[in-house]
Curated annotation (Swiss-Prot):
GO MF, one example: rRNA binding
GO CC terms, sorted: ribonucleoprotein complex; ribosome
Protein name from the UniProt record: Large ribosomal subunit protein uL5
InterPro entries: Ribosomal_uL5, Ribosomal_uL5_arc, Ribosomal_uL5_C, Ribosomal_uL5_dom_sf, Ribosomal_uL5_N
Keyword tags: Ribonucleoprotein, Ribosomal protein, RNA-binding, rRNA-binding, tRNA-binding
Organism of derivation: Picrophilus torridus (strain ATCC 700027 / DSM 9790 / JCM 10055 / NBRC 100828 / KAW 2/3)
Similarity remark: Belongs to the universal ribosomal protein uL5 family.
Length: 176
């Protein structure tokens, strides 16, 4: 008899991991935040700019106020292992959205393994976003010709994402 196996195209994979530091101002502090991201991810960060002017905070539209790095494939997996170590492998249940993505923050870059406080850099926290997708079929939403929506049965649920992180990264979910 044949044993039943899961369809490999329904397997969940990590699409990308986005690491963001929002500084809120341009200048030397922004450059130090970029240096922190480069030390942690070994990738050159991209600068994010303000979408609108806020006079109270002295921010003009188009002014660089943050840095981010997008990691994919093996780089994303290795960074996530370090990030979960910094969070003691515990993520709150409210960090997951209904689309199966996960978001959490790290309050200080010195929580990462092997990082020491540098007074020239200062203290920077960061936001981490993990975007999941199924192994196949997501191109139909992005392609130019015959665009379609992802069917409901192919969408990733919050529970599937939690199960994936528990199995692959030994993450404990707090607040179940």
């Amino acid at each position: 008899m044949m044993e039943t196996t899961e369809n490999s195209m329904r397997e969940i994979v990590i699409d990308k991991v986005v690491v963001n530091i929002g500084v809120g101002a341009a200048g030397e502090r922004l450059n130090r935040a970029a240096k922190v991201l480069e030390l942690l991810t070994h990738h050159k960060p991209a600068f994010t700019s303000a979408k609108r002017t806020v006079r109270d905070f002295n921010i003009r539209k188009g002014l660089n106020i943050g840095v981010k790095v997008t990691l994919r494939k093996d780089d994303a997996l290795s960074f996530l292992k370090e990030a979960f170590y910094a969070k003691d492998y515990k993520i709150p249940v409210y960090s997951f959205d209904k689309n199966g993505n996960a978001y959490f923050g790290i309050s200080d870059y010195t929580d990462f393994k092997g990082m020491k406080y540098d007074p020239d850099i200062g203290i920077f926290g960061m936001d981490i976003a993990i975007v999941f997708r199924r192994r196949g079929g997501y191109r139909i939403e992005k392609r130019r010709i015959k665009k379609m929506h992802i069917p409901k049965k192919m969408r990733i649920s919050k529970e599937e994402t939690i199960k994936y992180l528990q199995e692959n990264f030994n993450v404990k979910i707090i607040g179940d």
